[in-house]
């Protein structure tokens, strides 16, 4: 059936996945590929762009295609030439988004050769992938790689801008966004880039938001009990002017996948030597670096808390560029002072392994969506410290759902001032010493487990999507 091998048969629908750049986007696509191939009887091809922006992306793709073959295959998606100087100083991941978007016409021959039953595109590429799929009669679905709340904003934001334009409010900036049927997203929580109408990300976000109503369906890595208001509003279509919206498939939390057995990492050996629920795990994701002065305040706060901690430090946007000296980053003597009760690394870690470990009692997180769904899956309390993008929208969910707490006054990218060591230490002590925090997070974990169980809402939702792919295969 597919051009890259003879194992794909008409008995199994063939789903082509089109991820975009960044681990926050690629990880859920890898998990979806395995879930579809191993749990729901699909053949899967992943349109992979090389080279990747980061080393972590390259490692993940290599592991996926080795371990999940032959049910999961690579489709080499070669990009058209792209002049990055058109967007001086732009984020390297946003540049890759744009380069991939402009190469969308090249996706057509891949779909033709693969004889795809369906295309699942990243939301970042939706507005350019949808016409290509439509031309070929291939059903086009979107995998939304953030929360249902953020999907609501994406779907509603074009109408919000249109209403402002009609009222003559162009140029006054984005304010509070009241999404019908959902809730208010305060101005301070709207992703920073969306306040600039000329920003590359804003242009992509609006174009993709406008096209959502034309897609065949939207998969979201969340579960009904985690975001009941947003999921209900999306399914009822109350967030759109027309009152219509495609089917929404809540398929999360998509579970992490270990592709191969490896030697136990040194950070895991360290974790195993710590008492139950005694360790604070600190990670701000793979996408952004914290400014050095704030990094040192965080270091001092962790030290002052007196708690054990495992900290993954990042100093650059792209991991290939991360050559900083750890001791120099965190201040003279810090590593020596916390030796024994802390493990600090700049290396890549398997976060899902850490969050599953019984010694972890708190997760200080930037609120990237993959991180939050992993914390929810394992019932680990979260201290939310959003830094940019969708992360304040996600942090609000941490507080609403009972997964943890969000100190709304703590600074994020572009804001003046520092979150002090005293604030950090106080919050850590409070959350680590309060049993109700762990109990509420554990309830979220129970709800997540129920959702992905065979009769659960997320399992059934993914099966409904697969059945649509089977039906398309028969036509």
Curated annotation (Swiss-Prot):
The keyword ATP-binding does not apply. Its EC number is 2.4.1.-. It is an enzyme of class 2 (transferase). Expressed in radicles, hypocotyls and juvenile leaves. Expressed at low levels in roots. GO terms for molecular function: flavanone 7-O-beta-glucosyltransferase activity; UDP-glucosyltransferase activity. Belongs to the UDP-glycosyltransferase family. This is UDP-glycosyltransferase 708A6.
């Amino acid at each position: 059936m597919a051009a890259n091998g003879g194992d794909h048969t008409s008995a199994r629908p063939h789903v082509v996945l089109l991820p975009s750049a960044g681990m926050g986007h690629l990880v859920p696509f890898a998990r979806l590929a395995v879930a579809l191939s191993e749990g729901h009887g699909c053949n899967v091809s992943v349109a992979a762009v090389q080279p990747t922006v980061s080393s972590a992306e390259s490692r993940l793709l290599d592991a996926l295609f080795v371990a999940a073959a032959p049910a999961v295959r690579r489709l080499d998606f070669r990009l058209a030439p792209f002049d990055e100087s058109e967007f001086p100083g732009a984020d390297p991941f946003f540049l890759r988004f744009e380069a991939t978007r402009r190469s969308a016409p090249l996706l057509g021959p891949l779909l033709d050769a693969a004889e795809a039953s369906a295309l699942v595109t990243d939301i970042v590429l939706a507005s350019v992938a949808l016409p290509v799929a439509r031309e070929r009669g291939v059903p086009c679905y979107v995998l939304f790689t953030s929360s249902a709340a953020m999907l609501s904003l994406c779907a509603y934001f074009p109408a919000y801008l249109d209403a402002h334009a009609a009222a003559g409010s162009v140029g006054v900036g984005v304010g509070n966004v009241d999404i019908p049927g959902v809730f208010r997203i305060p101005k301070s929580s709207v992703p920073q880039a969306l306040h600039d109408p000329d920003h590359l990300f804003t242009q992509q976000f609006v174009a993709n938001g406008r096209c959502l109503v034309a897609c065949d369906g939207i998969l979201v890595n969340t579960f009904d009990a985690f975001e009941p208001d947003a999921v209900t509003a999306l399914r009822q279509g109350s967030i759109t002017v027309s009152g219509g919206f495609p089917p929404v498939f809540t398929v999360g939390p998509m579970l992490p996948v270990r592709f191969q057995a490896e030697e136990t990492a040194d950070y895991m050996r360290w974790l195993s030597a710590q008492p139950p629920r005694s360790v604070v795990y600190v990670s701000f994701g793979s996408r952004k670096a914290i400014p050095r002065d704030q990094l040192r305040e965080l270091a001092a706060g962790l030290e002052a808390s007196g708690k054990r901690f495992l900290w993954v430090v990042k100093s650059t946007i792209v991991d290939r560029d991360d050559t900083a000296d750890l001791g120099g980053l965190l201040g003279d003597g810090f590593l020596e002072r916390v030796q024994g009760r802390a493990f600090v690394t700049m290396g890549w870690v398997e976060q899902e392994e850490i969050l599953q470990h019984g010694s972890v009692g708190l997760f200080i997180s930037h609120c990237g969506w993959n991180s939050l769904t992993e914390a929810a899956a394992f019932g680990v309390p979260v201290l939310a410290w959003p830094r940019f993008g969708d992360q304040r929208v996600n942090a609000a969910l941490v507080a609403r759902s009972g997964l943890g707490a969000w100190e709304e006054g703590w600074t994020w990218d572009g804001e003046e001032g520092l979150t002090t060591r005293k604030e950090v230490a106080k919050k850590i002590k409070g959350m680590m010493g309060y049993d109700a925090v762990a109990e509420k997070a554990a309830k979220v974990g129970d709800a997540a487990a129920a959702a992905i169980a065979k009769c659960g809402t997320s399992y059934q939702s993914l099966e409904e999507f697969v059945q649509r792919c089977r039906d398309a295969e028969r036509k």
